[in-house]
Amino acid sequence: MPALLLLTAAGFSGYAALLPVAPLWAVHGGADEAGSGFVNGLLLLATIATQPFVPWLLRRFGTAPVLATGLLFLGGPSLLHLISDQLGWILAMSVLRGFGFGILTVTGSTTLAHLVPPARHGAAIGAYGASIAVPQVVLLPAGPWLVDVAGYWIVFALGAASILGLAATPWLARVLREQDVERLFHDAAAVDSTGADIQAQASGSHPQRRIAGRLARPTILLMGATLAGGALITFAPQMSSAPLAAAGGLAFFTVAAAVSRWRIGSIADRYGAWAFLWPLVLLAVVGLALTALAVENPGDTKVTLFLVALALVGIAYGGIQNLTLLLSLGAVSRNQYGTASAVWNIGFDAGTGIGSVLVGTIAAGLSFPPALLVAAAISLATLPLAFGRERHS
């Protein structure tokens, strides 16, 4: 597992460095809020388009080669941003990076699920979440600040850090061979291909439809949370009149998300996930509403309120990520972990992309406060889905 965590940290370093800065680069080239919102929106659209094919790629080529390809696609285009600040070029780089990010996200969570016994999934997801969150804690707030003090080039250089994860792929490949994890991917394919008709005849319904039904609730809840997070990560540097407030807000957001995602996993292993979901949904709604209030006056950000609001959303953002992945894995059998991981990651990235595009589009026509209130209303609409009982597969 350490090899997977190191590789994941490297990959997400490249992802996090550019997340708030690539939209700023588009604004530097003349794009408006809507155009800059599409930078991350298209990144995640390409991610979502890639993710359904990743389980097949893992079975066909193996985990280490697929991960290496993903890291190259994610980190390689970063320095190419320096060629042009025009929106079309930046969007093309977003597509390439999205391919790599789609591979990294599904492969990482699927491999994690197979490496760790189900009884320890919550704690393992917490550790995996920390390897994702720590780079974001450092690089999300640092990115806009580094642009101000040193220029865009240094952030684009940091974005290439994903390629450093290649050093851990041989180590991970050896661990997977020792634990015979690759065989599990092939066993899953065999079960899916030979057992689907038998299961369907016995139950009177298609098994994939039943799986989709089980995964729908956690996926929609996840989308409500990541819509909020995607909006704040993309636009915090643009919605605050004080650059240091934007950096501080992103720092509060990412630290809160990291701690929440890390700590809640082991707690959920003991008490279950559902008890914590509805309070976290409400926390996200309150945080978004307070953010809207903090940036009501474009020229005078209420800095303290802004920091508190982003921290509240961060707690919800991190906690809901962990709990919904735990519920998704618990809703399926072990040979369906690849499907559950792909669906969860699609929900994560769809919510993030929708938040980026939706809030950017509304802000371009109105302003950020009403855009954030719309995001809060969407998150609130997921609340009825946050009440449930534990299910054991």
Residue ranges and their predicted role:
Residues 50-62, 260-273:
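Helix-to-loop junctions at the C-terminal end of transmembrane segments
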Residues 1-37, 217, 221, 226-243:
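Helix-loop boundary and gating motifs at the non-cytosolic
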Residues 160-186, 385-389:
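C-terminal membrane-cytosol helix-exit motif in multi-pass small-molecule transporters
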Residues 62, 83-88, 294-295:
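Helix-breaking motifs and short loop linkers at transmembrane-helix boundaries and internal kinks
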Residues 95-130:
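Cytoplasmic helix-loop-helix junction between adjacent transmembrane helices
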Residues 65-79, 275-290:
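Structural signature of the two symmetry-related core transmembrane helices
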Residues 77, 88-96, 304-312:
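Paired small-residue
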Residues 44-52, 136-137, 254-258, 262, ...:
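Residue-level signature of mid-helix packing/kink "hotspots" within the transmembrane helices
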